[in-house]
């Protein structure tokens, strides 16, 4: 397969430049016959989750296509679902560069992107142009300059704008790169947010005559007590699913490696065991009442199977896709 050669060339570039170059090429082919260049035939293995039927259990995690620019090209690669975003009500540049770093030996990435995106209105226009007929998740967050205490307003604005176009909506309260965001995972702040989101979901269902499930994306750095509280809140508020997990602040498995001290969230293989353990504990707490979408360090069929064995119904990849390319999609979907 050609990807090892592509990767070698891309890895000569700064990580964000490599990302921009790749998306420049994908934008050129998305929605055109040139999509055949990236198309892969993968088996159909339907999975039902959150009341939706997914073509196969492997999805693209949020963060790669933040603005929904390359939906059709990514679909052609064989994903069972795509999660675009994180998107915010207003456009924002994100944190200062450099803000994306490779840990090549560990097959990990550290990012402190900070929800750089062109805003929810732009994303909706891109979704309208796409021909994608699969399950599209839209991951939403708050603007950096919105005070945390007003954060729920940003989520409600985004929900209203994406509801008609989303297969499901993902609530990102677990990125470590927006100051104070993770505090929304705890106690009264979480309850207030989930109450507002559930009320908005019910209102939008009445307006649009369709029910769009909501999943909450959580961090891997929750302690036991916090995890129990989160599980309890999700169940009490009848949230439809949970995405476990986002990136970690833990550097214990990458000590001494180049870039290991960079600020930001660590993803890829060093996150694999930590995220799987969170899924296992979450599954025990949820007792099958709420589906889990497993994400974090999946870079092989075995890693995907481990997430499912721990309690995930669906799995997603991001960093593994950067390091292994489209062949990883076919490999996982075929053998999972």
Swiss-Prot record:
UniProt: FMN binding residues:
62-66, 86, 139, 172, 217, 245, 268, 297, 318-319
GO cellular component terms attached to this protein's record = cytoplasm; plasma membrane
Q: Which reaction does it catalyse?
A: (S)-dihydroorotate + a quinone = orotate + a quinol
EC number in record: 1.3.5.2
**Where does the record place it?**
Cell membrane
Q: In which pathway does it act?
A: Pyrimidine metabolism; UMP biosynthesis via de novo pathway; orotate from (S)-dihydroorotate (quinone route): step 1/1
Q: Which PANTHER family match?
A: DIHYDROOROTATE DEHYDROGENASE (QUINONE), MITOCHONDRIAL (PTHR48109:SF4), DIHYDROOROTATE DEHYDROGENASE (QUINONE), MITOCHONDRIAL-RELATED (PTHR48109)
Role summary? Catalyzes the conversion of dihydroorotate to orotate with quinone as electron acceptor.
PROSITE patterns (alphabetical) = DHODEHASE_1, DHODEHASE_2
Q: Name one GO molecular function term.
A: dihydroorotate dehydrogenase (quinone) activity
**Annotated protein name in UniProt:** Dihydroorotate dehydrogenase (quinone)
- Here the disulfide bonds are none
Give the record's membrane topology: Peripheral membrane protein
Q: How is the cofactor bound?
A: Binds 1 FMN per subunit.
């Amino acid at each position: 397969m050609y990807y090892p050669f592509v990767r070698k060339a891309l890895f000569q570039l700064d990580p964000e430049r490599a990302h921009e170059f790749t998306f420049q090429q994908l934008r050129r082919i998305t929605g055109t016959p040139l999509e055949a260049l990236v198309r892969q035939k993968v088996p159909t293995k339907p999975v039902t989750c959150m009341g939706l039927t997914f073509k196969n259990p492997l999805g693209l995690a949020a963060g790669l296509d933040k603005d929904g620019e390359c939906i059709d090209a990514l679909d052609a690669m064989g994903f069972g679902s795509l999660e675009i975003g994180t998107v915010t009500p207003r456009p924002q540049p994100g944190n200062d560069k450099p803000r994306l770093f490779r840990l090549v030996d560990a097959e990990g990435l550290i990012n402190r992107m900070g929800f750089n995106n062109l805003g929810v209105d732009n994303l909706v226009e891109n979704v309208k142009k796409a021909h994608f007929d699969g399950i599209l998740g839209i991951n939403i967050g708050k603007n950096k300059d919105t005070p945390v205490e007003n954060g729920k307003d940003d989520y409600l604005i985004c929900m209203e704008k994406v509801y008609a176009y989303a297969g499901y909506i993902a609530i990102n309260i677990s990125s470590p790169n927006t100051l104070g965001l993770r505090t929304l995972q705890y106690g009264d702040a979480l309850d207030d947010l989930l109450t507002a989101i559930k009320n908005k979901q019910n209102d939008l269902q009445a307006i649009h005559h369709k029910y769009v499930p909501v999943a909450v994306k959580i961090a891997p750095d929750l302690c036991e007590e916090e995890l129990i509280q989160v599980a309890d809140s999700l169940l009490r508020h009848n949230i439809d699913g949970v995405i476990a997990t986002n990136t970690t602040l833990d550097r214990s498995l990458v000590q001494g490696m180049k870039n290991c001290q960079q600020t930001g969230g660590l993803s890829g293989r060093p996150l694999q065991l930590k995220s799987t353990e969170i899924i296992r504990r979450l599954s025990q707490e949820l007792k099958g009442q709420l589906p889990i979408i497993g994400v974090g360090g999946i870079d092989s069929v075995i890693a995907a199977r481990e997430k499912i064995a721990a309690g995930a119904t669906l799995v997603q990849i991001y960093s593994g896709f950067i390091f292994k390319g489209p062949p990883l999609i076919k490999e996982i979907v075929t053998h999972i």
